[in-house]
């Protein structure tokens, strides 16, 4: 175990839609890496129970994707509340990273942070205000050097833990190809 203020916290959420004022979080996962992007630990992967009324707010894409992955079934069978998910996730993070020092890391992580701010403010407050958003590098690469993108592809399962692993792998790819480190 390596508690360090240099460790990075990676988070991914799956939601019932894109509007944090309307939609809910249905899955959360976290991973802690060291500063070299080596995975140190995987946190709890939690399907968060939501009512049928909340699940009915999903659009066709969300319904098809989250049903096809088995997530909707896991959400329906879950007893985990949003607050329990916060508590379990923070209990995991406290073993690896001090509060307030790690940027929030992931792909399109600003969207996840909006949901955390609205639905899990205690967890959102665990992060530094900065972001490490892998999608920023992807968007810049797509515009400035699109050939590089042919060297990396994602499975796109839209399951939180898989998405984090892919985000870490994608950042490692950019580190090697763009930054040559």
UniProtKB/Swiss-Prot annotation:
Gene3D superfamilies: Ribonuclease H-like superfamily/Ribonuclease H
Cellular location(s): Cytoplasm
Main location: cytoplasm
GO MF term set: 3'-5'-RNA exonuclease activity; nucleic acid binding
Chain ranges of the Exonuclease domain: 8-171
GO BP annotations, alphabetical order: DNA metabolic process
Catalytic residue positions: 129
Annotated keywords: Cytoplasm, Exonuclease, Hydrolase, Nuclease
A Pfam family this chain is assigned to: RNase_T
EC number(s) recorded for this UniProt protein: 3.1.15.-
UniProt GO cellular component terms: cytoplasm
EC class: hydrolase
Entry similarity comment: Belongs to the oligoribonuclease family.
Function: 3'-to-5' exoribonuclease specific for small oligoribonucleotides.
Protein name in UniProt: Oligoribonuclease
Species of origin: Vibrio vulnificus (strain YJ016)
Taxonomy of the source species: Bacteria, Pseudomonadati, Pseudomonadota, Gammaproteobacteria, Vibrionales
């Amino acid at each position: 175990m390596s508690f360090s203020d240099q460790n990075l916290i990676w988070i991914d959420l799956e939601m019932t839609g894109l509007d944090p004022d309307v939609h809910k979080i249905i899955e959360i996962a976290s991973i802690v890496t060291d500063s070299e992007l080596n995975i140190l630990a995987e946190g709890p992967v939690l399907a968060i129970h939501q009512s049928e009324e909340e699940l009915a707010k999903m659009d066709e894409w969300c319904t098809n994707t989250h049903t096809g992955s088995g997530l909707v079934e896991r959400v329906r069978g879950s007893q985990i509340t949003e607050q329990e998910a916060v508590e379990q996730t923070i209990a995991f993070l406290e073993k690896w990273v001090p509060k307030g020092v790690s940027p929030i890391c992931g792909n399109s992580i600003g969207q996840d942070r909006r949901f955390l701010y609205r639905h899990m403010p205690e967890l959102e407050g665990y992060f530094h205000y900065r972001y490490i958003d892998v999608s920023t590098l992807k968007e810049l690469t797509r515009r400035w050097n699109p050939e590089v993108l042919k060297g990396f592809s994602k499975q796109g399962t839209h399951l939180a833990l898989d998405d984090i692993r892919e985000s870490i792998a994608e950042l490692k790819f950019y580190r090697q190809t763009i930054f040559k480190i």
